[in-house]
Amino acid sequence: MSSSPTESEILPKESHNSIDEQSQQPANTDTLVKDNSFNEQDDQEVDNDYKSNDEPVQSQDPISPNMASNESGNSENTSNYGSSRDENVYQKTTLWMGELEPWVTEAFIQQVWNTLGKAVKVKLIRNRYTGMNAGYCFVEFASPHEASSAMSMNNKPIPGTNHLFKLNWASGGGLREKSISKASEYSIFVGDLSPNVNEFDVYSLFASRYNSCKSAKIMTDPQTNVSRGYGFVRFTDENDQKSALAEMQGQICGDRPIRVGLATPKSKAHVFSPVNVVPVSMPPVGFYSAAQPVPQFADTANSTVFVGGLSKFVSEEELKYLFQNFGEIVYVKIPPGKGCGFVQFVNRQSAEIAINQLQGYPLGNSRIRLSWGRNQNPIAAPALNYQSQVSQTTIPATSLFPAMSLPPQAQFSPYPAVAPSPLALQTRGAPIGMEISIGSPALVPDQMHIPENGNSDTMPVPNTQGKHLSAEE
């Protein structure tokens, strides 16, 4: 069994800036630009809205005018807004307004537009669970001319605040109750999104080129609202979807080129558990490849994840954002120019879940590969020190038992982990002072102080230079 890459093999003890070129395998330089397909069912956390007609669960709502009427968190009666108008006229009188602060209310938005001389009706979309605004709303103006005039305020300061207007034309639905069958929707996957890119940026990029673009959604962590670096864009025209797949590959959004791929229809998407956590005992459901299996004789004190295939554009802060959703982090290290990094968690279970769920995750312009590293800042109990010491030496193979790089642990073997016994018995063929039992390799000292009568009231003191014996020695 080959040993896992360690930070000490990559980062010399005296300095983290000096790298041994032979200590690390070349980083995975396969980019994602050539991969033009993505199955939405492969994703760890496909939003429920893309799998069924149910409301999204604890996630930021997409920039979707059509979904405004489905948002149950806002109960005001707006079903008659513009109900007698022609669809084309309606689309020219309603604007989407985004990037709203959590404290923003409908009354505040209405007051802002009234200050600018606009009579408006506002529907603020709220999170159905928290009651807070979802970061966007729809504003209906008295006429197409008024709406067009209001669009000129895009990226200009909002009166009384230090924020800017973020405006766009609503592509349908808006303040009216409108039911559109999602069977006629066509989605694409959008990956490699920069952390500073929001849904407005993604929606604007696609809506400026494709008239049928109706919504954009960036997947975020439900607790922290931190972007996961990917999302989905919906179209009502299949031709626009196909054109976007062919034309938008590598287009710049924010400060990075994006990757697009075909998303599997929601009817084929796999439904995950409500908490979006896969038990460690279950088969891996990683992004692109099978998750790293936990070694049978694993060091139960290890909570460090080795991250390979890192893009040079990825920073330690971005890596921390990605992994912090799985548990409390001790530290994050990215050695310069090596295309890899290390993430140490407080709990081993957090590391196991991260390895299972983030294997092959698209980050930057490559897919990361995960495996077990070794703790550089041990936080485990002292009782595991012996196991850590033994793991440094490989036990030689015998005709009966294969070679092992770690001793059997209690949870994997009928034999408990064995340390040198203070009252060890003499066994034929074995050094004095040590008992050898099958399945329980022991650390045998080179020298032990034994009284001539063979009895001692004190534990033999082993030399620090020890060796391992197999069952045959």
From Swiss-Prot:
Entry-linked InterPro entries: Nucleotide-bd_a/b_plait_sf, RBD_domain_sf, RBM42_RBP45_47-like, RRM_dom
UniProt protein name: Uncharacterized RNA-binding protein C23E6.01c
Domain RRM, residue spans: 95-165, 188-260, 305-370
Record GO biological process: mRNA splice site recognition
SUPFAM superfamilies linked to this entry: RNA-binding domain, RBD
GO cellular component, one term: cytosol
Keyword field contains Hydrolase: no
Compositionally biased residues, Low complexity: 69-83
GO molecular function term, any single one: mRNA binding
Residue span of region Disordered: 1-86, 448-473
Source species: Schizosaccharomyces pombe (strain 972 / ATCC 24843)
Keywords, ordered alphabetically: Phosphoprotein, Repeat, RNA-binding
Positions bearing Phosphoserine: S64
